[in-house]
Amino acid sequence: MTSKAMLYFSYTKPKVWSLLVFVGAIGAVIAIPYFNLHYISLIVLATIAVMLGSMGAEATTNYIDKDIDAVMSRTMKRPLVTGQIKPINGLLFGLVLMFLSIAILAAFGKLYAALFMGIGLFDNVFIYSYLTKRRTPWNIILGGFSGGFPVVIGWYTVTSKFSILPWFLFLLVVVWIPIHVWSLAYRYRDDYNRAHVPMMTSIHNDRISAICISSAAIILFAFSIIPAFFRVMPMVYMILASAIAVPMIFYSIVFVRHPDRKNSLKLFIYSSPYLAIIFVLVLIFRFL
């Protein structure tokens, strides 16, 4: 891969969208009744579409946020800020990728998946980044729905049959996003204050922020075991999911008792693998 291609690839923030592509692929796999070449090709289609959409959304929001990125220490080295990529080129790159993500699904007749892709992109780019990020601390709640759509897109790329399972997973990701974003935002609250972005952690004191973040962690745990109560996952899944949640709940309690950046970072670091592990458990028990 050339240095220019690598630059544009890094511009899409692969560390951000890689987990979304993962849950999108899981959403496709759990929808198949058995493995054959046809279903494998649909899994690949879903994965490519989610990757294109996620890359496009991140590239476009980079354009929208370029003035914010310029004053935040965590983001001031991004390509639009440093001038490595011209703003118009960055915007067009993002728009083309988003268009391709919808077009490729529509071209293969996956209209439900294309519709959900469009809704997810609209929520991420317009509702979150353009409309609410600079105006309300509810920004990540209103814009968090976009993070749940990859699993639904994966499911409806494979089948048009309704199931409650992908929507449970959709809600799980939506609930996961606040704890993941807020625990990181707490660490960089000075950056958000400097950029005048009203994140929940930048407008409330340490204790309230810690309570909100830790409450989100408890809600995430509750949502992760709900599928067992609706009999779409076995009880052994609930037991394992509960065991995996113990460190997260522990870190949440510690964070409330001692709200500081060190403890918020511990919660942030654990939240990413937690979601991935839950999805792996769902995948395993789907086929057992």
Curated annotation (Swiss-Prot):
Gene3D superfamilies: UbiA prenyltransferase. It is found in: Cell membrane. Its EC number is 2.5.1.141. The keyword Cell membrane applies. It is a multi-pass membrane protein. It holds the Pfam family UbiA. GO terms for biological process: heme O biosynthetic process. The keyword Nuclease does not apply. GO terms for cellular component: plasma membrane. Its main location: membrane. The chain crosses the membrane at residues 16-36, 37-57, 88-108, 111-131, 138-158, 162-182, 210-230, 236-256, 265-285. Keywords: Cell membrane, Heme biosynthesis, Membrane, Transferase, Transmembrane, Transmembrane helix. Pathway: Porphyrin-containing compound metabolism; heme O biosynthesis; heme O from protoheme: step 1/1. CDD domains: PT_UbiA_Cox10. GO terms for molecular function: protoheme IX farnesyltransferase activity. It comes from the Archaea. It catalyses: heme b + (2E,6E)-farnesyl diphosphate + H2O = Fe(II)-heme o + diphosphate. Carbon 2 of the heme B porphyrin ring is defined according to the Fischer nomenclature. Converts heme B (protoheme IX) to heme O by substitution of the vinyl group on carbon 2 of heme B porphyrin ring with a hydroxyethyl farnesyl side group. NCBIfam families: cyoE_ctaB, PRK04375.1-2. Belongs to the UbiA prenyltransferase family. Protoheme IX farnesyltransferase subfamily. This is Protoheme IX farnesyltransferase. It comes from Thermoplasma acidophilum (strain ATCC 25905 / DSM 1728 / JCM 9062 / NBRC 15155 / AMRC-C165).
